[in-house]
Structures are given as C-alpha cells and as structure tokens.
C-alpha cells in the first residue's frame, strides 16, 4: 500500500483519462448530486436500479455502488442481483449502509445483502458501522451520533468477517482492513450541512476503485479527494448552498498543486 500526494494525483489523472463507468443503485435524495460529482472528478455515472437491467449494466461498468438510502422491495432485489454479478465478474462493490440501526428492516436488509455477497468496501459513519456489529445501536436518520474513533473496533470486526476495506467517515476518516490502517484528515465542517456528501463520497471512492486494484488505496484516495475539494470550496462561500456548487467546481478543477498543498493523511 502506498498512499501519498503523488499516488493520489496519479489516480486522479487515471480517473480523468479512463472515465470509468460507475454503476449506482443509490437513493432518490442524492442521485443528481452524486452523478454531478462523478462527472466532475472525471468518471461516467449511471443510475440504474431496474431489476431487469442491472446484470447487463454491471457487466459494462467498472465498479458498483450500493446505497440503501431509500429502500424498497424491488430495489433490494435489484441490489442482490447486481452484487452477485459484480462479485462473479470480480468488479469492486462499494457499499453504503445508510441509516443502519435506524429500523430493524433497514439493518436486516443490509446484513442480508453483505452476508450473501461481501462487498469490497463498506463506507459509513461511525453509528452506521457500529450498528452493523452491535445490537441496540440507534442512529438519528443518516447522521452519526458516535465519534468515528469509537467505531474502529467494530470496523475491524466487519473487515475480518467480510474481508472488506472499512471506511468510517467523519471529521477524520478512518480506513482499514485486516492488516492496514490509514487516517485522512481532510474536509470542512460545513460539508455536514450539505445533504448527500457522504453518499457522494461512496461513489467517488467507487470511481477510484475502478482504476486501482488496491481497495485501501482507492478508498483513501477517494476520501482525500473529497476532503481536499471540500476544504478549498469552503474558503469563499456564504453557506451550504454555495458550497454545494463550489464543491463541484473545485472537484472538477482539482490540481496537482492542490493535492500536494492540502493532503493530510497518516498511514
């Protein structure tokens, strides 16, 4: 594993050059913002959740995003199919357990999906990650009520059980597998006031996973790119509304100098 400003910039250029197709089965709230962020970083988004076409879509995609934000029975069936096909084709699956712990149905659905087809990467906030391991943990909607540090032991358990890279997002992003750990400290507090930026991070990570076979590197690079863009974008905005627009512009124009001057990462 090698994660630094040079490798991050290398992968940003690779995403821009290769424009990987990222297949998203995601929620209604974030479809537009997620697609725009993927376009801004240089990837090609597709939002397809019809059970009748997900196998074909996964076949041509570079990676798969499963985001359970707005659950329905039909979407869950499509998620099962898409994950099985991606696993069969050895394509990265990036899973976002939105609101895990909020309701029994939501938590059980997540556990069934990842038990049947373990994902390559799981990205969630600390409450969501802990809810997948500990009974009785409650989340407040999709917002975390726990510190990211408190979820590290739960993340280690999940990684061991499913063989996945686990990303606990927060003010500091903790990324680990069974052998490696990295901490990303980029971002800005105002990013929490823009709905869907966590879900967007999951999709951006999937773009990097499509071009880098190291899931640890891909996760760290994706989270760092999001955080750096958020930091720069927040410098000259009045509030969350203008941040959302400026974030996309910054992600699009992110430069090698930006990466080298802003990256805060500890491996």
Curated annotation (Swiss-Prot):
Substrate binds at residues 47, 196. InterPro entries: Hyethyz_kinase, Ribokinase-like. The keyword Magnesium applies. GO terms for molecular function: ATP binding; hydroxyethylthiazole kinase activity; magnesium ion binding. Pfam families: HK. Pathway: Cofactor biosynthesis; thiamine diphosphate biosynthesis; 4-methyl-5-(2-phosphoethyl)-thiazole from 5-(2-hydroxyethyl)-4-methylthiazole: step 1/1. The keyword Transcription regulation does not apply. It catalyses: 5-(2-hydroxyethyl)-4-methylthiazole + ATP = 4-methyl-5-(2-phosphooxyethyl)-thiazole + ADP + H(+). Its cofactor is Mg(2+). ATP binds at residues 123, 169. One of its GO terms (biological process) is thiamine diphosphate biosynthetic process. Keywords: ATP-binding, Kinase, Magnesium, Metal-binding, Nucleotide-binding, Thiamine biosynthesis, Transferase. Its EC number is 2.7.1.50. Belongs to the Thz kinase family. NCBIfam families: PRK09355.1 (NF006830), thiM (TIGR00694). HAMAP family: Thz_kinase (MF_00228). Catalyzes the phosphorylation of the hydroxyl group of 4-methyl-5-beta-hydroxyethylthiazole (THZ). This is Hydroxyethylthiazole kinase.
């Amino acid at each position: 594993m090698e994660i630094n400003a040079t490798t991050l910039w290398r992968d940003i250029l690779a995403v821009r050059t290769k424009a990987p197709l990222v297949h998203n089965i995601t929620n209604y709230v974030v479809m537009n913002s997620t697609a725009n962020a993927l376009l801004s970083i240089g990837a090609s988004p597709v939002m397809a959740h019809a059970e009748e076409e997900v196998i074909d879509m996964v076949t041509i995609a570079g990676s798969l995003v499963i985001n359970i934000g707005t659950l329905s029975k039909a979407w869950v069936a499509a998620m099962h199919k898409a994950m099985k096909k991606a696993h069969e084709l050895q394509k990265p699956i990036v899973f976002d357990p939105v609101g895990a712990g909020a309701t029994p149905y939501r938590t059980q659905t997540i556990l069934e999906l990842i038990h049947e087809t373990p994902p390559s990467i799981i990205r969630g906030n600390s409450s969501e990650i802990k809810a997948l391991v500990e009974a009785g943990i409650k989340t407040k909607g999709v917002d975390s009520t726990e510190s990211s540090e408190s979820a590290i032991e739960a993340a280690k358990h999940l990684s061991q059980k499913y063989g996945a890279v686990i990303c606990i997002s927060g003010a500091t992003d903790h990324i680990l597998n069974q052998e490696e750990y990295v901490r990303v400290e980029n971002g800005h507090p105002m990013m929490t006031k823009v709905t869907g930026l966590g879900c967007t991070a999951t999709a951006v990570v999937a773009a990097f996973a499509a071009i880098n076979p190291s899931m640890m590197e891909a996760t760290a690079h994706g989270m760092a790119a999001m955080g750096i863009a958020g930091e720069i974008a927040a410098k000259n905005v009045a509030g969350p509304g203008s941040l959302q627009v400026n974030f996309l512009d910054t992600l699009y124009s992110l430069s090698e100098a930006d990466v080298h001057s802003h990256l805060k990462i500890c491996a």
